[in-house]
Regions:
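C-terminal auxiliary extensions adjacent to catalytic cores
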Residues: 1-36, 40-49, 74, 135, ...
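Short gly/ser-rich anion-binding loops that grip negatively charged ligand groups
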Residues: 67, 87, 91, 110-114, ...
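FAD-binding glycine-rich core of flavoenzymes that anchor FAD
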Residues: 113-139
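Residues that scaffold, gate, or flank divalent-cation-dependent active/transport sites
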Residues: 13-57, 61-99, 105, 117, ...
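Generic short alpha-helical segment signal, independent of protein family or function
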Residues: 66, 82-89, 102, 106-109, ...
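Short helix-coil transition sites and intra-membrane helix breaks within transmembrane domains
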Residues: 113-114, 147, 333
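FAD-binding core of FAD-dependent oxidoreductases
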Residues: 55-77, 84-107, 135-158, 173-191, ...
């Protein structure tokens, strides 16, 4: 079956695009403009290298930056560089993360600031479209460049390391020595991993609203806390968005609320889940900006015919945004568990403890609270900010690190844990609604209930619930899709690529 085509142009890649390409849902192509920008940058890089010192092209790297590459060694220096930097350690990262790295590096080079020979782009795209991955060890980067991951990629292109799985005709490109550092000096692996996590979490934080609405209906909670007037009084965007979504999902006739005030799991949902919505949106915007940035050091400025040595290799923005997202996810996960606690409590449901239907003291869904809290414990652990660390490296000349790589990895690990938390709440909410004989009045929530009730087993006697939790996890993307479109752009802070058409900002090489 033909797959949809994703065109990489260096300007418009989104987190969802990276996820689709990394997971084989689309075929990747390069735009003509992206190829042209990459080629123009390569020409300027060659021109500049012949006339001035350029870090990594005519010099060593790190603490060796003041050491010039001799003319007699120029053809071998780059190969030694990629070989020596392909030294990561630990287990290999997931294949989809490796392919995400390749997609991001193609788009970065197409943005037109690296100076790398554009011929490498075809080989990288070929690898993605064949479903290949680079064997990238998990440890080797600290948020200032994924040197080990990109060096391993370079060795795969050179034929010194095998692609995974090894194809009959491996993608091949002989990187020229001056292009070695320009190719590996990138955060493509970190940014690619962040993009996949942001894509997944954007979907889950939307699904969480639908799940919460089902729980709300099951305990006959009050809709008063979601009133528009309440949230106009404190107009945080995410808070207002969650409240509006709840008003829409719970629309329809409702009887008098049984309590003057509900527990925080319902009453404070907009105030607690809203920050997660905002944090997911902000992280997506930050990562999207990185996806389309020519964040190269040195930066090849085609318009100015200049080379700029700079600090755009540092990804503090990414790490801090992801750290904030994980903290927000812990808060809303705890609120999901609080709602689960009301669903097993007769005072809120009017049903037997733990929604059991066998003779007392049957356990019903008791174990789901333990499962959810186990996952939340991991979310709490993973919410520790990676940005609290730092490092001094390469004989003291690289004296700071933001550890965005570790932040991206922690955010990846949060995804399945948060998914489990929501799945436990969904299983409980659907069972409570069934047992109470309640059907949602609003179209979207009715669709959500019918979808979940049609997939989850109706049997309520004590039995293993692991299969229910797996099924509930699979339903979450469809529950997210039932919400109206987001009122604000999900992930669009475009970075203007370096291009020949951009007005010149530098007359020549900086001193």
């Amino acid at each position: 079956m033909d797959r949809p085509v994703l065109v990489l142009d260096g300007m418009s890649l989104t987190c969802g695009d990276v996820a689709a390409a990394a997971r084989g849902a689309v075929q990747v192509e390069l735009s003509a403009d992206g190829r042209q920008r990459a080629g123009a940058a390569a020409e300027v890089a060659a021109y500049a290298t012949a006339r001035r010192e350029v870090y990594g092209r005519t010099t060593g790297v790190g603490a060796n930056r003041e050491t010039a590459v001799s003319s007699g060694d120029a053809a071998r220096h780059g190969l030694r560089l990629v070989r020596s930097h392909a030294g990561g350690g630990g287990p290999l990262i997931a294949a989809e993360l490796s392919r995400g790295m390749l997609v991001v590096r193609v788009n970065q080079i197409a943005a037109g600031g690296s100076g790398v020979d554009p011929g490498v782009l075809d080989a990288l795209i070929d690898a993605v479209n064949k479903g290949l991955s680079v064997p990238v060890p998990a440890w080797g980067a600290i948020g200032t460049g994924d040197l080990t991951a990109l060096a391993m990629t370079a060795l795969c292109l050179l034929g010194e390391r095998d692609w995974v799985p090894r194809p009959a005709r491996p993608p091949h490109f002989a990187l020229a020595s001056p292009d070695a550092l320009a190719f590996i000096s990138s955060n493509a692996a970190t940014i690619g991993e962040a993009a996949l996590a942001c894509s997944d979490l954007r979907e889950l934080v939307r699904a969480a609203i639908t799940v919460a609405a089902l729980s709300h209906l099951a305990v006959r909670a009050s809709t008063e806390p979601y009133a528009e007037q309440v949230h106009a009084a404190r107009p945080h965007p995410g808070q207002q968005e969650v409240a509006a979504a709840m008003r829409g999902l719970l629309a329809g006739p409702a009887g008098p609320a049984p309590r003057i005030q509900d527990p925080y799991g319902y009453r404070a949902l907009p105030q607690v889940h809203g920050p997660a919505v905002d944090a997911a949106r902000h992280a997506g915007q930050i990562v999207t900006s990185e996806l389309n940035a020519a964040a190269e050091n040195p930066l090849i400025d085609v318009a100015g015919q200049a080379v700029w040595h700079n600090g755009n290799f540092h990804t503090a923005y990414v790490g801090l945004a992801l750290d904030a997202l994980r903290a927000a996810l812990f808060q809303t996960s705890a609120l999901s568990a609080a709602r689960l606690g009301t669903l097993v409590e007769p005072a809120f449901t009017g049903l037997a403890p733990f929604l059991a239907t066998d003779p007392p003291p049957s356990s019903g869904i008791m174990i789901l609270e333990y499962v959810a809290q186990s996952a939340i414990a991991d979310i709490r652990r993973l919410a520790t900010p990676a940005a609290l660390g730092s490092a001094v490296l390469s004989r003291g000349v690289e004296e700071h690190a933001g550890f965005s790589t570790q932040s991206a990895r922690a955010t990846t690990d949060v995804v399945p844990a948060y998914r489990i938390v929501l799945a436990c709440e969904l299983v409980a909410a659907v069972r409570a609604l069934r047992l109470r004989g309640i059907r949602p009045a609003g179209r979207s929530l009715a669709d959500a209930f019918e979808l979940a009730a049609g997939a989850l087993p109706a049997q309520t006697s004590d039995r293993p619930l692991d299969g229910d939790v797996v099924t509930a996890q699979r339903l979450l993307p469809e529950l997210a899709a039932l919400l109206p479109p987001e009122p604000l752009p999900a992930e669009r802070l475009p970075a203007e690529p370096v291009s020949p058409e951009r007005p010149a900002t530098a007359a020549g090489s900086p001193p």
